[in-house]
Amino acid sequence: MNNPFRYGIAVDEPYFIDREQEIKEFSRWLKSGQSLVVYSPRRYGKTSLIIKILKNLRKEGYNTVYIDFFKVSSRRRFAEMYYNEIMQHMPSWEKALKKISGLTKKIRPVISLDGQGLPSVSVNFEGGSENDDLTEVFDLPQKLADRKSWIVVFDEFQDITRLDGERFEKELRASVIHHTSVSYVFMGSRMHMLLNMFTHRNRAFYQFGKLYELKKIPTDILADYLTEGYTNSGIRVKPEIPDKIISLCEAIPHYVQYLASAAWEEAQENDTVLDYDVLEKAVSRILTNQIDYFMKQYEELTAHQQKVLLAICKENKNIYTSDYAGRYHLTPASSTQRSVQRLLRTGILSRDADVYNFNDPFFRMWLKSSMA
């Protein structure tokens, strides 16, 4: 029997959990021309959700583009990826090359065959520099939208900072503001950076798009999913175990799947029974496997950042009060604020009102057991 749980990759049925309301709302907004800014901490399932939505929209006749800025190392690489995504919707590579070449003068696509004989797109900057204006690249979906509208997704959009971010941001905004047949989705998990781009008056994308925070999946839906996955794969799971998995993982979809998968593997070695002892072994195995990564994360912090992180590990709300500072010997307050801002920017923590949460619950478990 195969493990019924998947993590670490974008998933579809049968591993995709719920999000029915988000699928309906996002699809309706995008089809009406509304652009979106979707944010949440990492591992909440943003990518799986949007890929599923794009798949559905393609079936309805829309053209789609998906660009993950985590993989974009240069302006040239962006142009290559953008052209490649757009060409997927053309009848043939030959027609695609002819069509796009007719619409671009400065940045032209070049098609060659890779080592496996498959077409590969590169670009030729006619001006000789990849610092040339990318406007004609940005404008392609609008120019090609004669019969079909386009949906363009920029994942981890805050990572444009690696591409001379301010200039790239302004160039893109100057183009997309005129696109009447293209809806855009800007997504990101470094929420502090992404929200700054869309909520600060001095930024190019100020108030562009509908802001949407992707929340956690309801725990009852997660519990039903886990119970069904175990039962259908021959695991005798104790009734309270699914809720315990969800609690340990703080209902973060990726980590719920991660622990559920590890517990399934342990149960296979325990006569297909999943109880508290087996779950504890699964947690222990995960922490052991991740120890080098956790140590690296911790050691890259300053001494004060480590001190603040350990305090939040024990108590994660009202962290700027004098009582809190006294309990954990955090002085001065300005240093604590700087350390917290750093922990937010790097994605170790996320903030919900006055509560600060670990984005990786296993990192928190490791800190509590090893450092606190």
Regions found by a protein language model. Give the residues of each.
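P-loop NTPase nucleotide-binding core
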Residues: Q34-S35, P41-Y44, S48-I151
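Helix-loop-helix "sensor" segment of P-loop NTPases
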Residues: N196-S247, E269-D271
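Conserved Walker B catalytic segment
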Residues: N124-M191, T199
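C-terminal leucine-rich, beta-strand-based interaction scaffolds used for sensing/assembly
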Residues: N2-N3, I177, T288, D292-A372
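A short, basic N-terminal segment
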Residues: M1-L36, P41, S350
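Conserved C-terminal helix/linker of AAA+ ATPases
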Residues: E266-N289
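Short, locally clustered residues in the helix-turn-helix/winged-helix DNA-binding domain
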Residues: L30-K31, Q158, E250, W264, ...
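C-terminal helical "lid" of AAA+/P-loop NTPase domains
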Residues: P242-L248, H254-E269, K307-L310, Q341
